[in-house]
From Swiss-Prot:
Gene3D superfamilies membership: P-loop containing nucleotide triphosphate hydrolases, Translation factors, Translation initiation factor IF- 2, domain 3
Task of the protein: Function in general translation initiation by promoting the binding of the formylmethionine-tRNA to ribosomes. Seems to function along with eIF-2.
Region (G3): 76-79
Binding site for GTP: 12-19, 76-80, 130-133
Stretches assigned to the tr-type G domain: 3-223
Name of the protein in question: Probable translation initiation factor IF-2
CDD domains for this protein: aeIF5B_II (cd03703), IF2_aeIF5B_IV (cd16266), IF2_eIF5B (cd01887)
Keywords from the named record: GTP-binding, Initiation factor, Nucleotide-binding, Protein biosynthesis
Organism of origin: Methanococcus aeolicus (strain ATCC BAA-1280 / DSM 17508 / OCM 812 / Nankai-3)
Length: 598
């Protein structure tokens, strides 16, 4: 059975050389315009195996490799955002990835992000340790690294510096994250150890080694996945929809299996439903030397086989979302394709909660990745959509926050707040998190959640009735009733204005309306040991219902007793706990219910 090209994605931190590497790969041997040269697809570059064999012949001979794949298809858009956007059933579209790391700088936030995404998707990868040309004393060449890595070609100090940087900035950070890795020439078992290929995207050093490693690993471990269904219909993923001069609305896509034919029907899975449209044209870019007119950039194809990038001209392509699954089928298979796509969408659909936050992302794949990471930290998700944040989203978030303030948040990955939403965010005090690094967004959200919980806990605790036991001081009954005014000692706990007080039989005496200090000024609370005059509004008559030296308890509602008991015993002072325990003991005795307050 024929094999297709493995699909390769390049990930890594900003400025570590992703684009430079792709540019260098694309330029390899292109200037010679030889037969079988690198083909520029829509959104991808195909490097035929003949080119790889030619530029890497010495290395292939040294390794004894027998490469049978037709080549490799490198996704042109680098970075983890593109990687997460390009999905297929069962995971990432890319068969293998290149994680690029600046050997001089080491791991940075987006490196960690990329590694997390690869781990989550179980995508095999090689590490390209870039910028070796910047190592002190390193003599870089345009060719294989392995033949340049010796004492005949390099100064001993440069070799020592290389080993130090390789270990400290690449091997050790990978080990910290659970990956065994080593220089590719030292790896004995590629199924257990990550291959590190030193490269220079500037000089071209190590590019042959990298291409051979990618090809060899893909062929060895993914042969089953690379078997091409040459007779079958095409399966793919939407890259983007855009306007093309002379063509109108077109769609760029990556096809990873089967054959697409002109006149077939394209079936696309969209969050709003299945879109079906008949293909007017299958387009591929013309080679540079074929472009007589800049407006005439494409050539029409009758059929195109996987793996490939292509442009599709068809009606009704509005509102198609990047990352959406697609099928290209003859008319009699449209219903089957629709059913397949519905099943695929249901498999990957984000499970929403009854209450929670709103998340937004630029593509379906990004949205899935964001939701997955948020779930790991216990986030509840009420709404998950592709696109920017509108005024309607903010108003919805404010309504969610009414149920629980922790729901008043919107997380935006590669999305933005629309103009009409910005003022609403301020008006409704909705917390927003914006960024292009998922793990950083999740960390920030987690930190905010922690702070909010502490704040809410503090607010709830402060709203709860504080336990207290009071004694009426002899000679300090100043007014017997309406209001009853007397001096009390706070024996245990904290007495607050607004609480109800009961006697030792549990009978309510009234509500504490005022507490005064020694200067006869109103205060909000009195703590243990304080002697203060208080006024009680209620039916109590001092001297008849209760008298000097008698004990009063602050009345604690049973629901509040449960909350205090379960959540806040550690927040109570020792004397407050004493007041609480004595009151609960009294209530259980009076109610003849040992489970009161539990």
């Amino acid at each position: 059975m024929a094999l297709r090209c493995p699909i390769v994605s390049v990930l890594g931190h900003v400025d570590h050389g992703k684009t430079s590497l792709l540019d260098k790969i694309r330029k390899t041997r292109v200037t010679q315009r030889e037969a079988g040269g690198i083909t520029q697809h829509i959104g991808a570059s195909e490097i035929p195996i003949d080119i790889i064999k030619k530029i890497s012949k010495d290395l292939i001979k040294m390794l004894g490799a027998n490469l049978t794949i037709p080549g490799i298809l490198v996704i042109d858009t680098p970075g983890h955002a593109a990687f997460t956007s390009l999905r297929k059933r069962g995971g990432a579209l890319a068969d293998i990835a290149v994680l690029i790391v600046d050997i001089n700088e080491g791991f940075m936030p987006q490196t960690i992000e990329a590694l997390n995404i690869l781990k989550q998707n179980k995508t095999p990868f090689v590490v390209a340790a870039n910028k070796i040309d910047r190592l002190p004393g390193w003599s870089s060449v345009d060719g294989a690294f392995i033949t340049n890595f010796n004492e005949q070609k390099q100064h001993p100090n440069a070799l020592t510096e290389f080993e130090i940087k390789l270990y400290e900035n690449v091997i050790a950070p990978l080990a910290e994250r659970g990956f065994e890795a080593d220089l590719f020439s030292r790896v004995k078992d590629v199924s257990k150890t990550i291959n590190i290929v030193p490269i220079s995207a500037m000089t071209g050093e190590g590019i042959p080694d990298l291409l051979v490693m990618i090809s060899g690993l893909a062929q060895r471990f993914m042969e089953q996945n690379l078997k091409l269904n040459v007779e079958g219909y095409a399966k793919g993923t939407v890259l983007e929809v855009k306007e093309e001069r002379g063509l109108g609305k077109t769609m760029d896509a990556i096809i990873y299996d089967g054959v697409a034919k002109r006149g077939d029907y394209i079936v696309i899975g969209n969050p709003d439903g299945i879109v079906v449209s008949r293909i007017k044209a299958l387009l591929k870019p013309k080679a540079l030397d074929e472009m007589r007119d800049p407006r005439d950039k494409f050539k029409t194809m009758n059929e195109i086989s996987a793996a490939t990038g292509l442009k599709i001209s068809a009606p009704d392509l509005d509102n198609i979302i990047a990352g959406s699954p697609l099928r290209i089928v003859p008319k009699n298979m449209v219903e089957q394709a629709k059913a397949e796509i519905v099943e695929e969408i249901e498999e990957t659909a984000i499970q929403l909660d009854e209450e929670g936050i709103i998340i937004k992302a630029d593509t379906l794949g990004s949205l899935e990745a964001l939701a997955t990471e948020l779930r790991k930290v216990g986030a509840k998700i009420k709404k998950a959509e592709v696109g920017d944040v509108s005024k309607k989203d903010v108003i919805e978030a404010s309504s969610y926050a009414q149920t629980n303030p922790l729901n008043g948040a919107i997380i935006l990955f590669n999305s933005k707040l629309l103009a009409d939403a910005k003022s609403e965010v301020e008006k409704y005090e909705i917390k927003t998190f914006e960024g292009d690094i998922i793990y950083k967004l999740v960390e920030d959200y987690e930190e905010w959640t922690k702070e909010m919980k502490e704040l809410l806990k503090s607010d709830e605790f402060n709203r709860l009735t504080k336990p207290a036991i009071l004694r009426i001081i002899p000679g300090c009954i100043f007014n017997k009733t309406k209001p009853a005014i007397c001096g009390v000692e706070v024996v245990y706990g904290t007495l607050r204005v607004g609480c109800s007080v009961v006697d030792e039989q549990g009978k309510r005496l009234g509500t504490v309306k005022e507490i005064k200090d020694k200067k006869q000024e109103n205060i909000k609370e009195a703590k243990v040991g304080m002697e203060v005059p208080i006024s009680i509004d209620g039916t109590v008559i001092l001297g008849r219902h209760i008298g000097e030296d008698d004990i009063m308890y602050v009345e604690l509602p049973e629901p509040e007793v449960r909350i205090l008991s379960h959540n806040y015993m550690g927040e109570l002072r020792g004397d407050e706990r004493e007041a609480f325990e004595r009151y609960v003991e009294l209530k259980r005795k009076l109610e003849n219910n040992p489970f009161w307050g539990i």
